[in-house]
């Protein structure tokens, strides 16, 4: 059972920001998601392709406590979709991603740390 760790030094928009973008017009939310996925793929391209189910621990590191936790961790959807788009996962359904855990810390650099564990 291998564990892979990757840092994504990226400040994701809050869920509220994403919803507001989606309300602007029918293309704005999709364009925002596409841009975020392209940014994420830069960091996840060094990952291998996972052929067995995985679980992921997300450690969300923020510079302060201003944003609600649920407004931060919704971004896992962008990360998982990016992993599928980059060919690292066949799909992000329950057959391939069997669980995840969110933890939150505060530091100088806003980022998310993924700990991906292959399950057998």
Model-flagged regions — what are they?
Residues 1-120:
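Catalytic phosphate/metal-binding cores of nucleic-acid and nucleotide-processing enzymes, i.e., regions
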């Amino acid at each position: 059972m291998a564990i892979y760790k990757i840092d994504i030094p990226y400040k994701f928009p809050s869920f509220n920001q994403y919803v507001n973008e989606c309300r602007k017009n029918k293309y704005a939310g999709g364009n925002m998601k596409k841009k975020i996925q392209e940014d994420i793929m830069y960091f996840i391209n060094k990952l291998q392709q996972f052929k067995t189910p995985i679980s992921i621990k997300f450690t969300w590191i923020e510079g302060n406590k201003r944003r609600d936790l649920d407004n931060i961790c919704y971004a896992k959807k962008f990360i998982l979709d990016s992993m599928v788009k980059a060919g690292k996962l066949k799909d992000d359904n329950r057959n391939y991603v069997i669980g995840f855990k969110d933890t939150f810390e505060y530091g100088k650099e806003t980022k998310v740390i993924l700990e991906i564990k292959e399950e057998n």
